[in-house]
Amino acid sequence: MLRCDLHTHTSYSDGTKSPQELIKLAQERGIKILGITDHDEIAGIEEAMEFASKVGIKIIPGIELSSIYHDIDVHILGYMIDYKSQELKNFLKYVKDIREKRAYRIVEKLKRFNINIPLDILKKHAGYGAIGLSLIHI
């Protein structure tokens, strides 16, 4: 039987493992096909594909897009995406910028309650992921 996992996240979004670490884990578990579906992010796909090709794992390039439908948060999985598309990259940058601005506003509101969260610490914790500085880090 061919083992696969089509819904995974790397440290480029809310996963804890880099693309290489995730692929090593997949290899240890006998997974031959791995879908990289980071939240609103595609930055780890190329890195994953390059490393996976060396260890015999097929990467399905994907994404998990966040959206709202009738005031309900939904996540939409997309597979076999064009991760090199400049239009997609521009859209994802726009989404990241909106999240970061919202996070800054929340930090400012928390100061009114004497809750001071240094932005440099939040940015360090957020790392390089697509989620960027977001609610998850506050």
Regions found by a protein language model. Give the residues of each.
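Cysteine-centric redox/oxidoreductase cores and disulfide-bonded domains
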Residues: 125-133
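Conserved phosphoryl-transfer catalytic core
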Residues: 99-125
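Active-site gating loops and adjacent loop-to-helix segments of metal-dependent hydrolytic enzymes
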Residues: 68-100
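An N-terminally biased module of ancient metal coordination in phosphate/nucleic-acid-related enzymes
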Residues: 1-72
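Alpha-helical scaffold segments that flank or form the walls of functional sites
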Residues: 22-33, 97-109
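Generic hydrophobic/packing signal
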Residues: 63, 80-82, 114
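Conserved small/polar residues in nucleotide/adenosyl-binding loops
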Residues: 136-138
